Amino acid sequence: MTQILSCEWAIFLKSSGYIIYITKLIGGLMELNKIATVKTGLVLSRKESKDASERFEYRQLNLKAVCDNGTININDTIPFYASEQLTASYLTQVGDIVVKTSEPYTAVYITEEYANLVIPSHFVVVRVDITKALPQYIAWYLNKDRIKKAFSMSCAGMLKQIKPTMVGATEIKLPSLKRQKQVAELYEISNQEIKLLEKLIEQKKKYYKALISNVNRIK
């Protein structure tokens, strides 16, 4: 495990060693809808308030807020004013997986940080039976390039939008829960390092931009 964790960056970039290791952890196939409920999000117009004096305020998930690396930028979520208090089924819950219905079909595992966001209809919501599978593992699996390519090839029209039935019919390679946990932990470690590196890149960009501006002002 130490050797694997010492090269998390290479892991995330799909080095051959990582793919081989993950492949060894995988078991038999099972359709997602056998181990999870899969449905579309809320049609917002059905619950949107038309009365400014009588409404319930929420934060709403949107396509812009979902990053390609499977995270959510909370700052990009937007307000949603409902005509009534929404039931939990319309909101993100810890352990949920939300999948963009449009390319690149990014799947996001919902942590405490991403909970209680309104899920609109351009997302598919996957709620996994945790006695059969780990949601973190399923999120990793749905983000595989092969799965995304299959979604794209199965869609008709310019928008290439997927439906809950298509997501539910996805065949998942399902090893033991112990093996799933190993995969999920590796995936989480790689994502954490990626986020740190991306933050460092942004800081470096700002630093050099300021440095160049200062040099340019010197006479």
Residue ranges and their predicted role:
Residues 33-49, 64-94:
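Sequence-specific dsDNA recognition surfaces
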Residues 96-99:
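Generic structural signal for buried aliphatic residues
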Residues 117-122, 157-181:
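A short glycine-rich beta-alpha junction/loop motif
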